[in-house]
């Protein structure tokens, strides 16, 4: 990619394939409760005591969105750990009755059969492997079982490359490659975590950084998801290739976040994670409306693939 695209030439980003451009993508943070306590997880994203989100509000809000957007609605549930919500089964039953493109990110601690059952509600599940907690002897066979029983639904393992657990990381990658299980490799970044102010998980050696780049270039989970216009040419790539170029900040660009991309966190709606201090509404408000036009980005960086691939252009 570096031979095809120069960072300074990029003028426009949009989702790929093109039919996804007008979808409403919702990153839905279902709650901070989590059964893990990873040293590199942001304080805002996890704890073991926050109250659970009211599932009635979630179900009702999704129903209203579905009435408006129908098959143009795409939702990804995150946390915390979504499956620890005591009423998560109610959400699964509701989603299974709707024709909505729904995905979820989970730490994969439930039994394998649990996940193969809830695929009736989810088109895709991402299983994040956190090596401070997930033991290969347990986690790897579970992923193999799910891969063999998921039918036409899709999955992806997100291998969190922990600098202090390198042997386990490499063992997992070899296993996924041998058993043809889709995976991606994620480099850990510093976060605000009051319990772990010194975060050794991302104290990478130069060799480890080279390994991460090599794995990211050869892993099996990267499907092009963004169209990039650079020097009057259009390329389809994966967002990880853009972040590899150092492209995470679009401050000052015009962006459709708030129009066809939103984040829901504790019922408050945000354009994106970078504008977390400025909600644009409350998802439970019957009068809540999405924005109707692009606004300049005021965030310091995009934090995930759906944010990066939301339509934006340099001005």
Regions found by a protein language model. Name each.
Residues 38, 114, 135-137, 167-169, ...:
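Short acidic, gly/pro-rich beta-turn/loop elements at beta-sheet edges
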Residues 46, 130, 188:
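Flexible loop residues that form catalytic
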């Amino acid at each position: 990619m570096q031979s095809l695209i120069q960072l300074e030439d990029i003028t426009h980003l949009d989702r790929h394939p093109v039919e996804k451009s007008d979808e409403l993508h919702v990153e839905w943070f279902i709650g901070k409760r989590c059964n893990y306590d990873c040293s590199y997880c942001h304080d805002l994203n996890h704890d073991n005591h926050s109250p659970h989100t009211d599932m009635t509000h979630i179900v009702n809000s999704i129903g209203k969105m579905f009435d408006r957007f129908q098959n143009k609605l795409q939702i990804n549930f995150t946390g915390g750990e979504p499956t620890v919500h005591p009423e998560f089964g109610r959400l699964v039953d509701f989603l299974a009755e709707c024709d909505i493109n729904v995905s979820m990110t989970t730490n994969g601690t439930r039994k394998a059969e649990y996940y193969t059952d809830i695929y009736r509600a989810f088109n895709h599940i991402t299983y994040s492997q956190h090596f401070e907690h997930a033991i290969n002897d347990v986690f790897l066979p579970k992923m193999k079982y799910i891969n063999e029983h998921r039918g036409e639904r899709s999955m992806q393992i997100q291998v969190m490359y922990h600098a202090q657990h390198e042997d386990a990381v490499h063992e997992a990658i070899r296993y996924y490659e041998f058993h043809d299980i889709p995976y991606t490799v994620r480099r850990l970044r510093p976060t605000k975590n009051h319990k772990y102010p010194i975060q050794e998980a991302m104290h990478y050696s130069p060799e480890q950084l080279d390994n991460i780049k090599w794995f990211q270039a050869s892993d099996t989970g990267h499907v092009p998801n963004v169209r990039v216009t650079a020097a009057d040419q259009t390329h389809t790539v994966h967002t990880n290739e853009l972040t590899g170029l150092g492209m995470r900040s679009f401050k000052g660009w015009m962006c459709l976040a708030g129009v066809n991309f939103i984040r829901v966190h504790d019922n408050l709606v945000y354009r994106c994670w970078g504008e977390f201090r400025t909600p644009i509404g409350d998802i439970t408000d019957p009068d809540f409306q999405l924005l109707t036009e692009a606004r300049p980005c005021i965030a310091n960086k995009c934090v995930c693939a759906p944010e990066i691939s939301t339509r934006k252009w340099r001005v």
